[in-house]
C-alpha cells in the first residue's frame, strides 16, 4: 500500500480541513504572490522576535471579517525560559500596528503550558539536541513522554466542526550525522501504537524540522495518530 510522508493532504476534505481557503482561480497571480510574500515575511518577523524574547510560537489563526484581517498568535515559553517577561509584546504590537494598515487586528495569547502537537515535539527535539544529548537518548525521552500521553484526549478541528480525539500511536524519525567518528548519516526510528497512514477515519499530525549542528544538518520528523472519540456540536458518525 502507498505510504505518504505527509499524510495530511490525503485526508483533506474527508476528516481534516485546509489551513487556508484562499483560491486564485481566475485571479491575478501577482496579487496572490504579494499576499503570500507579505504573510511569510510577517510570520518570519514574529517568530524571530518572539524567540529573541524567550518564547516559541505555538500556532497562528487567520480570520477575515468585513474587510478586516484578524491574526491570533498563540505562544508558549521556551523550554529554558524560567521567567515570563511579557513587556516586550506591547512593543511588538505597536511595531505590527505601524507596519500594517488599520485593517489588521492582532491578538496575542500566552499558553503557559504546551499542548501536545507535532510542532511541540519537533521544537522539544531541537532543544534536546542543543543540550548535546545523543540521538538514542533523545528518542528514549520522546517515547517515554508520548507513551504517558497515549489515549489522552485532544479537541481537533473536524470538517463539520470540532471533535474530541484520543492519541493512539506515534512515529518519530531522527536522521543525520551525530557521531564525529562516523562520516555517514544515520537514521533512528521509533513507532508505538496504531499507525495507519491510509485510514481516512483517523487524524494525523505531521511536522518536520531541520537542526543545524557542528556535524551537519539533522532532520526530525514526527507523526501523531488520533482517532475520533466524541463528536461535538451535535454531530455524529451516522451523518458522515
UniProtKB/Swiss-Prot annotation:
Broad class of where this protein is predominantly found: mitochondrion
Gene3D superfamilies given in the database record: Ribosomal protein S3, C-terminal domain
Matches recorded under InterPro entries: KH_sf_prok-type, Ribosomal_S3_C_sf
Superkingdom field: Eukaryota
Keyword Ribosomal protein belongs to the record: yes
Keyword Ribonucleoprotein in record: yes
Assigned GO CC terms: mitochondrion; ribonucleoprotein complex; ribosome
UniProt subcellular location: Mitochondrion
Membrane-spanning ranges: none
GO MF annotations, alphabetized: RNA binding
Swiss-Prot/TrEMBL keywords: Mitochondrion, Ribonucleoprotein, Ribosomal protein
Entry's family note: Belongs to the universal ribosomal protein uS3 family.
Protein name: Small ribosomal subunit protein uS3m
Gene that this sequence comes from: RPS3
Amino acid at each position: 500500500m502507498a505510504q505518504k510522508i505527509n499524510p495530511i493532504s490525503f485526508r483533506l476534505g474527508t476528516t481534516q480541513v485546509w489551513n487556508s481557503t484562499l483560491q486564485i482561480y481566475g485571479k491575478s497571480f501577482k496579487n496572490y504572490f504579494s499576499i503570500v510574500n507579505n504573510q511569510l515575511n510577517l510570520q518570519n518577523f514574529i517568530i524571530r522576535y518572539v524567540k529573541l524574547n524567550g518564547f516559541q510560537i505555538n500556532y497562528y489563526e487567520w480570520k477575515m471579517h468585513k474587510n478586516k484581517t484578524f491574526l491570533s498568535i498563540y505562544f508558549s515559553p521556551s523550554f529554558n525560559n524560567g521567567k515570563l517577561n511579557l513587556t516586550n509584546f506591547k512593543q511588538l504590537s505597536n511595531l505590527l500596528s505601524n507596519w500594517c494598515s488599520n485593517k489588521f487586528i492582532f491578538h496575542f495569547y500566552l499558553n503557559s503550558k504546551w499542548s501536545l502537537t507535532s510542532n511541540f515535539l519537533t521544537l522539544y527535539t531541537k532543544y534536546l539536541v542543543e543540550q548535546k544529548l545523543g540521538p538514542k537518548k533523545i528518542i528514549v525521552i520522546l517515547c517515554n513522554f508520548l507513551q504517558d500521553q497515549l489515549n489522552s484526549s485532544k479537541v481537533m478541528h473536524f470538517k463539520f466542526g470540532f471533535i474530541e480525539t484520543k492519541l493512539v500511536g506515534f512515529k518519530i524519525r531522527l536522521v543525520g550525522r551525530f557521531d564525529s567518528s562516523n562520516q555517514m548519516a544515520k537514521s533512528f526510528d521509533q513507532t508505538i501504537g496504531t499507525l495507519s497512514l491510509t485510514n481516512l477515519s483517523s487524524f494525523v499530525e505531521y511536522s518536520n524540522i531541520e537542526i543545524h549542528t557542528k556535524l551537519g544538518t539533522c532532520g526530525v520528523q514526527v507523526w501523531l495518530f488520533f482517532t475520533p472519540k466524541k463528536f461535538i456540536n451535535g454531530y455524529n458518525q451516522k451523518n458522515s
